[in-house]
Amino acid sequence: MTLLILLRHGQSVWNQKNLFTGWVDIPLSQQGIQEAIAAGESIKHLPIDCIFTSTLVRSLMTALLAMTNHSSQKVPYIVHEERPDMSRIHSQKEMEQMIPLFQSSALNERMYGELQGKNKQEVAAQFGEEQVKLWRRSYRIAPPQGESLFDTGQRTLPYFQERIFPLLQQGKNIFISAHGNSLRSLIMDLEKLSEEQVLSLELPTGQPIVYEWTGQKFTKHAPSLG
C-alpha cells in the first residue's frame, strides 16, 4: 500500500483576520498550531517516507508540527537542493532516523495579486460580492495581477508529475503539506474533477486527506485510516 497524504496548513494569522494571504509569508495562529498537531495525531501511524511543502512558512510549520508525534519517531530534515552539501548527513545510523523534506514554490498558495493583505469583506464591499466570488471561486478568472486556479495548476501539476509521482511509483509514501488552492488543483487531477466540480471543493485547514496509489489509480480513503 503506497500512500499520498495531503494536508492544508493550519489556520494562519491572516486566515484568522480574514485577509487575502496568497504568497505573503504569514505564520500559523495559535489555533493553526493546534490544528497541525491534531492533524499529526490522525496520521501518526501512517508510513511516511518523504515530505513536500511549499516555500511558505505556514506550510512548513504545519508539516513539522504534524510530525512531532509520529509513531516512527523519525525527524524531518530540510533538504536544500540548491546546496546539497548543506544537508548531507554522514552517519548512516542517523540517516535511518530521518525523513527528507523538500520545499518548492510550485506548491505555494495561489497568488492573489493586488488583493493580498486586504480584508475579504472590505474587498467585497468595494468590488461587489459577485466579482469577488468570481476571483475566489471561478476556475480561470484571476484577481488583478494574481493567479486563477487554472494558473496555480499550471505550476503545481508539472511539479507533482515530475518530482513526486515517480516516488509514489517507487512505493514511497508521500506527505504533502500545502495550501487550499495548490491542493485543490492537485485533487482536481487526482479525482478527475471537471472545472465545474472543482469549484465546490472546499478544504478545511488542518484536516488530512489520504489516497492510496494502487499502481493504476488513486483511491481516496476514509478519514479514519490513520
Swiss-Prot record:
The record marks 179 as: Transition state stabilizer. InterPro entries: His_Pase_superF_clade-1 (IPR013078), His_PPase_superfam (IPR029033), PG/BPGM_mutase_AS (IPR001345), Phosphogly_mut1 (IPR005952). Its EC number is 5.4.2.11. Disulfide bonds: none annotated. Pfam families: His_Phos_1. Substrate binds at residues 8-15, 21-22, 58, 109-112, 120, 136-137, 180-181. It catalyses: (2R)-2-phosphoglycerate = (2R)-3-phosphoglycerate. Keywords: Gluconeogenesis, Glycolysis, Isomerase. GO terms for biological process: gluconeogenesis; glycolytic process. It comes from the Bacteria. HAMAP family: PGAM_GpmA (MF_01039). Belongs to the phosphoglycerate mutase family. BPG-dependent PGAM subfamily. Catalyzes the interconversion of 2-phosphoglycerate and 3-phosphoglycerate. PANTHER family: PHOSPHOGLYCERATE MUTASE. This is 2,3-bisphosphoglycerate-dependent phosphoglycerate mutase. It comes from Chlamydia trachomatis serovar L2b (strain UCH-1/proctitis). The lineage of its organism: Bacteria, Pseudomonadati, Chlamydiota, Chlamydiia, Chlamydiales.
